[in-house]
């Protein structure tokens, strides 16, 4: 009994069949078929999607033939939606420049050179601007040497081909520009040289003195006595009129010695003509007085009324006057 119960509790295992490996191969075939079925299902789904897309039609026209109105757009863009960028994000903050007071102070404290220092620096130069050296070959000043006439052909090596002209002429000069420069120097020295200036002043003073001496004898004989008295008391025998005019010229700041001789002659001749006219006027006044006295005398004494002249006229006038007084 006990064994039967144990048999019921513990049943013997069933023997395994040899068809088990065949069952293992089945799932492989089943898997392939399932994969193929999946591919076929995906292809069918794509065909269904294509059919769905082909069924969608886009209609842009209405049934009545009019096109729908386009959607309204705002005239102005919404500026509020535009993100604003701040300057602080764009530009990095730069540090403030530091003032360099020391450099500015040193630049301000630099003093300009004084006149004494400038003159001392200028006095160190040994160049004489008035020098005109003598050419040893010709014995003439260097600015008066004529290259074509004074120098022989052998003394012109700069004319040879291949010669560097800067070995004979400095500062960019050549034979032609040096001739022009020398001529210009001679002209300037002739006009503004110290010797020429002194000679011109001397000649001007001589002309001035000759003009003064010739002008003293010009006035007429009527005023010769007064002029001689004026010359004796005047300056260097100068007439009073000339002396007064010279004083006026010097008082106004003019130097008579620096004036043009022709201008001085014109001034003195005008003054002398004015003096001669005054003398003639004085003589005419004397003649008028003499004629008037003669006429009065003739009128008083009752001289011949037929006498011609200024005196007779005066007499006739007097006689007529007496008659008119009688008639009144």
UniProtKB/Swiss-Prot annotation:
Residues 111-126 have a biased composition (Low complexity). Residues 1-159, 301-328 are annotated as: Disordered. One of its GO terms (biological process) is mRNA processing. It is found in: Nucleus. Residues 1-11, 31-58 have a biased composition (Acidic residues). This is Pre-mRNA polyadenylation factor FIP1. Residues 13-30 have a biased composition (Basic and acidic residues). Its main location: nucleus. Residues 301-321 have a biased composition (Gly residues).
